[in-house]
Amino acid sequence: MKRLTAVLSKLSGSRLDILFANAGGGDMLPLGAITEEQFDRIFGTNVRGVLFTVQKALPLLSAGSSIILTGSTVSIKGTANFSVYSASKAAVRNFARSWALDLQGRGIRVNVVSPGPIKTPGLGDLVPEEHRQGLYDALAAQVPLGRLGAPGEVGKAVAFLASDAASFINATELFVDGGMAQI
């Protein structure tokens, strides 16, 4: 947050057209083993971090600006041992609903891009290296398209939501998950 504040203070008097609040972090934690520290860290990154990033950027956002938040398919689809992360992403989804109303008089759109299983280092780091391919295969089997997504596919969805082509899209959640959350 300190770095963000420093960057935004340098932009004083400038305008921000697009804010992509891309925060995500979590651990596979069985229900009986979740600690307060783990809960606070995950919610701190995924919920508190997003809230205060958007709040600090508000003075730079003008009519026509777009805020895009990173959600996740797990916010609507149960996932064993991932309840804290899932709950944090459900909170982010609801930020978009509320903030679209909070900002309606300013003409600022707020949307969520919700990736499914995307082949990133963060996904692989959820399990020990010797189990990664098994994780990838198990997740791909749950995706109707039969594969994991690529980071660039999420980036294209974000670019769309930020563009004028999405000028009448607000408070929506766009799933980039090969259909996983929809069936």
Question: Residue spans of the language-model regions?
Answer:
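Short, small/polar-rich loop/turn modules that mediate ligand/substrate recognition or access, typified
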Residues: 104, 109, 169-171
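Short C-terminal tail/terminal secondary-structure segment
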Residues: 77, 158-159, 170-183
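Residue(s) in the substrate-gating loop at a strand-loop-helix junction
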Residues: 72
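Alpha-helical segment proximal to the catalytic Tyr-Lys
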Residues: 59-60, 101-102, 167
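Active-site helix of classical SDR
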Residues: 54, 88, 96
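Substrate-binding pocket helix/loop in short-chain dehydrogenase/reductase
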Residues: 30-31, 35-43, 135, 139
